[in-house]
């Protein structure tokens, strides 16, 4: 199949960029962008490769994404080696095809076509690309954003190429994401022999009423943009492995996916109040992965909706569901942030694939968004 979007996607898939290794993907993109007049700035931190590229000046539309992928898993279960892209029945198979090398290829080809038609475009077109999104996400987009903010870079609109669609490309776009807050809680007791409970203090027994109350709390009711805040216990650990020892500590890890109805500080206060109410001895460590963000209807959302309606003749759903994305960092710059990418049904799975025709369509959508905002 001779299509520049498919060809570039295949070239990117052939580079086994297991997070945070870029494996040469960014060099491939940079070569194409420099050829059409982009200025490229490398922003590497630790073992992570990032770049910020721009062309023109004025109102800025950035396309953001990541070159890294998750491990392939059992390669023997793939219909083809995961880093050897193949097309079967119109589907392009390969690790990263949907998440998100297809989007990266569509962005680059869209930029090439846009610049060819609008060499003197009015606004600034930019790219923010990282190799650290799938793993720790500590040296990737967040560090680039901090650098850009420190020098007062302008970023008005950002389109993240995460695979947002569910059945056909463009049926769902994400105009926000919930916040993510993790609590690592240790309840302290006194270890002892199970036959002498009066000489010990079992932290599991102590914590049980608190846990029962914790899981029953309705944190909020959500709002028109976000579902209700969710709390899920992810890990519980206690005991020595012996059946005759009362444990001295209980470790509980739980995560909140929270809406704009709450702040991380409010959640922390409510958890601490619950622990104190039950008179527990505890230590707690909090990790805020990201604040919730929302892009209301405006120029970017309207441009994205217009592009989808024009090329796919459907009206997309605007949702904030799912996990976190690098959009949470970019939103700090005050930018309108929207995620639009291919169908996500096979991401992170064996035999990850994407409809090849969808990638061609996605490139056209990206180009039309550019034309509406920075032409």
Curated annotation (Swiss-Prot):
SUPFAM superfamilies: Bacterial exopeptidase dimerisation domain, Zn-dependent exopeptidases
Residues that hold Zn(2+) 2 according to the record: 99, 134, 348
Matching Gene3D superfamilies: Zn peptidases
PANTHER family: ACETYLORNITHINE DEACETYLASE (PTHR43808), N-ACETYL-L-CITRULLINE DEACETYLASE (PTHR43808:SF31)
Cofactor note: Binds 2 Zn(2+) or Co(2+) ions per subunit.
UniProt keyword Amino-acid biosynthesis, yes or no: yes
Organism: Citrobacter koseri (strain ATCC BAA-895 / CDC 4225-83 / SGSC4696)
Active site: 68, 133
Full protein name: Succinyl-diaminopimelate desuccinylase
Documented EC number(s): 3.5.1.18
Known catalytic reactions: N-succinyl-(2S,6S)-2,6-diaminopimelate + H2O = (2S,6S)-2,6-diaminopimelate + succinate
């Amino acid at each position: 199949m001779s299509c520049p979007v498919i060809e570039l996607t295949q070239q990117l898939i052939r580079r086994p960029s297991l997070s945070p290794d870029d494996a040469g993907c960014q060099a491939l993109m940079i070569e194409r962008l420099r050829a059409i007049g982009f200025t490229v700035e490398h922003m590497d931190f630790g073992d992570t490769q990032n770049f910020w590229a721009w062309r023109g000046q004025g109102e800025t539309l950035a396309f953001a994404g990541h070159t890294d992928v998750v491990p392939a898993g059992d390669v023997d279960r793939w219909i083809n080696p995961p880093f050897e892209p193949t097309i079967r029945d119109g589907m392009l198979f390969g690790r990263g095809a949907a998440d998100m090398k297809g989007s990266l290829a569509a962005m680059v080809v869209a930029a090439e076509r846009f610049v060819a038609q609008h060499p003197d475009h009015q606004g600034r077109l930019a790219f923010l690309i990282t190799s650290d999104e799938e793993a720790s996400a500590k040296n990737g987009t967040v560090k680039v954003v901090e650098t850009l903010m420190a020098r007062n870079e302008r970023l008005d609109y950002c389109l993240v190429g995460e695979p947002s669609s569910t059945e056909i490309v463009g049926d769902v776009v994400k105009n926000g994401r919930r916040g993510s807050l993790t609590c690592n809680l240790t309840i302290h007791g006194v270890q002892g022999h199970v036959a002498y409970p009066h000489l010990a203090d079992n932290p599991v027994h102590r914590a049980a009423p608190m846990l029962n109350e914790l899981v029953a709390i309705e944190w909020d009711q959500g709002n028109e943009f976000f579902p209700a805040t969710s709390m899920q216990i992810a890990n519980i650990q206690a005991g020595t492995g012996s059946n005759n020892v009362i444990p001295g500590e209980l470790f509980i890890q739980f995560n909140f996916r929270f809406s704009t109805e709450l702040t991380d500080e409010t959640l922390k206060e409510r958890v601490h109040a619950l622990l104190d109410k039950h008179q527990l001895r505890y230590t707690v460590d909090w990790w805020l992965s990201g604040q919730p963000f929302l892009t209301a209807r405006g120029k970017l959302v309207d441009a994205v909706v217009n592009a989808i309606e024009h090329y796919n003749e459907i009206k997309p759903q605007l949702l904030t569901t799912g996990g976190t994305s690098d959009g949470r960092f970019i939103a700090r710059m005050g930018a309108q942030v929207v995620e639009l990418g291919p169908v996500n049904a096979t991401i992170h799975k064996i035999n990850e694939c994407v409809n090849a025709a969808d990638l061609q369509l996605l490139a056209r959508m990206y180009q039309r968004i550019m034309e509406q905002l920075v032409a």
